[in-house]
């Protein structure tokens, strides 16, 4: 629904546009990326668990699961892969329920309110973590 749902909050960039932007940035910084999107909590947990042992970092926008999913939190903690939480909007300045993030507890950084550029910033943070 990216680009369709509440464009005044999330912008008009589509998911396809976002994927292209991420892939271009990955090529620029010499990173490999695997893009994944699901509306199903269990699928996201499965994907995180499958990343164990073969992934250097996770950039995650858990959407509404940010505020409800102990399962995603536990999956991120279990795999212990450096993770950055990203939100296109500034969730901390929106409704009170959006200010709760379970996922944040398992991430070394959170980027909110930077639009789709937040994903690129998250990639940079993970890269910098491995360079230092």
Model-derived segments and spans:
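Glycine-rich phosphate/diphosphate-binding loop of Rossmann-like nucleotide-binding domains
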Residues: 1-29
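Short, glycine-/small-residue-rich phosphate/pyrophosphate-handling segment
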Residues: 34-35, 84, 92-132
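Short acidic/histidine-rich motifs immediately flanking catalytic phosphotransfer sites
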Residues: 51-58
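Short Gly/Thr/Asp-enriched flexible loops that form oxyanion-binding sites at enzyme active sites
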Residues: 69-78
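Short acidic active-site motifs
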Residues: 43-47, 68
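Short beta->alpha junction loops
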Residues: 32-42
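Short glycine-rich anion-binding loops that position phosphate/pyrophosphate groups of nucleotides
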Residues: 1, 63-66, 89-91
């Amino acid at each position: 629904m990216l680009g369709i749902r509440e464009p005044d909050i999330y912008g008009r960039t589509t998911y396809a546009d976002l994927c292209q932007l991420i892939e271009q940035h990955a090529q620029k910084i010499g990173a490999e990326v695997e893009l994944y999107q699901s509306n199903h909590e269990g699928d996201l947990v499965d994907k995180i668990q499958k990343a164990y042992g073969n992934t250097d970092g996770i950039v995650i926008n858990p959407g509404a699961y940010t505020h409800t999913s102990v399962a995603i939190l536990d999956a991120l903690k279990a795999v212990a892969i450096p993770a950055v939480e990203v939100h296109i909007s500034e969730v901390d300045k929106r409704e009170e329920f959006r200010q709760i993030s379970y996922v944040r507890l398992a991430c070394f950084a959170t980027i909110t309110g930077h639009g789709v550029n937040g994903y690129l910033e998250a990639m940079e943070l993970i890269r910098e973590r491995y360079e230092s």
